[in-house]
Amino acid sequence: MKKSLLTLSLLSSLSLYGCGGSSDYSGGRGDMPNGELTLSITDAAVDNASEVWVQFSAIEIKPESGPSITHVFDTPMRINLLSLQGSLSQDFFNNLSVPSGVYNWVRLAVDTDGVADSYIIMNDGMHELTIPSGSKSGLKISNGFIVGANSQTAVTIDFDLRKSVVMSSGQYKLKPVLRLVNNDEAGALNGSIDAALTTGANCSDQDPKTGNAVYVFAGHDASVDDIDKISPDPVTTALMSLNVQTGNYDYEVGFLPAGNYTVAYTCMADLDDPEVDDAILFQSVTNAAVDAPVELAGADFNR
């Protein structure tokens, strides 16, 4: 079975934890007491997929000083990332006792052995997911975070599928674009889109179920563009769903660091290839401000 963390890396880590287990750090690192860490995952969805399952076998975190710490799951966690949109998330572990202090990065071990451990379900059926660089290096998030002494810290990984799922040589590949957010420093953004905008002349098609998404860019009055790994790229994106009571389409973006944002709506998101500079049109653009923690900001799009 292929894993995105080498066995050697796991064995050389400072300590191994089983799922639901507790740590050995009764006295913390040096004279510092422990803190409790909760690590979760959320997702920004992608068009034309009904399910995206990724199987995680371990989590590795790296203190600023000293060797890394690895949490190995007794049973690998297989998660449908498409079920974690908006402000929804799933814990990898909850209130795990770890040494307090600064941590430099997080690495995810993902199973991709080609036997339906990690896969995507598209309109034409199920396809295995491969991770080009994951067999040796894992999925690494270089954002740092701090675990406070004798306190609880919660951070969430945004696994942005719209930026991460690419088709290459007939295979679906994960080239993950991951960001790490401290929950206490993050809020959420929601709004609605007039149904008439979802079937306009500039849309990719006349089906309101495809291509409709909001892209969120850092700062007010920011330039907006497609996803192509060239600035400006959105911080994150969100799909929308029909509100049967209003007849409009609603969206929610969770785990956004507090600050100012430019929110852009497009009905051409299904044409956005993250590997290519596409001519995506944005039908409406507005500014929004997000407060923390977990304060909902609004940004609506009307005809």
State where each predicted segment sits.
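C-terminal motif of bacterial Sec signal peptides marking the signal peptidase cleavage site
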Residues: 15-18
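Positively charged n-region of N-terminal signal peptides that target proteins for export
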Residues: 1-4
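A short, solvent-exposed, low-complexity linear motif enriched for acidic/polar residues
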Residues: 20-258, 262-303
